[in-house]
Amino acid sequence: MVNPGRTARALCLLCLALLLLGQDTHSRKLLLQEKHSHGVGNGTTTTQEPSRENGGSTGSNNNGQLQFDSAKWEEFHTDYIYTQDVKKP
């Protein structure tokens, strides 16, 4: 006999795995679009520095990985910390 609770848990885990795979695929697609657009926004929210192969400088760590504007990420982090402080003083 099939246990309904175990079946429901298995079904939920399967759906969660499919959603995570779909999200990963979507993220990779956005990164590829951003890489092919040579750092121009094209409506996406990532702010990348141009890669060395496109004539730009990626700093000291140039191993082919995408580099992001650290000032923008610091701003996001500061905004997040401020928001958390306001919510839970």
UniProtKB/Swiss-Prot annotation:
Record's signal peptide: 1-22
GO MF annotations in UniProt: growth factor activity
Changes after translation: Sulfation is important for activity and for the binding to a putative membrane receptor. PSK-alpha is produced by endopeptidase digestion. PSK-beta is produced from PSK-alpha by exopeptidase digestion.
Main location per the UniProt record: secreted
Entry-annotated residues carrying Sulfotyrosine: Y80, Y82
Tissue: Expressed throughout the seedling. More abundant in fragments containing shoot or root apexes where cells proliferate vigorously.
Cellular localization per UniProt: Secreted
Keyword annotations: Developmental protein, Differentiation, Glycoprotein, Growth factor, Secreted, Signal, Sulfation
GO cellular component assignments: extracellular region
Single biological process term from Gene Ontology: cell differentiation
Region (Disordered): 33-70
Positions annotated with a glycan in the UniProt record: N42
Residue ranges annotated as propeptide in the record: 23-79, 85-89
Similarity comment text for this entry: Belongs to the phytosulfokine family.
Note: The N-terminal tripeptide (YIY) is the active core.
Protein name per the record: Phytosulfokines 1
Gene name for this UniProt entry: PSK1
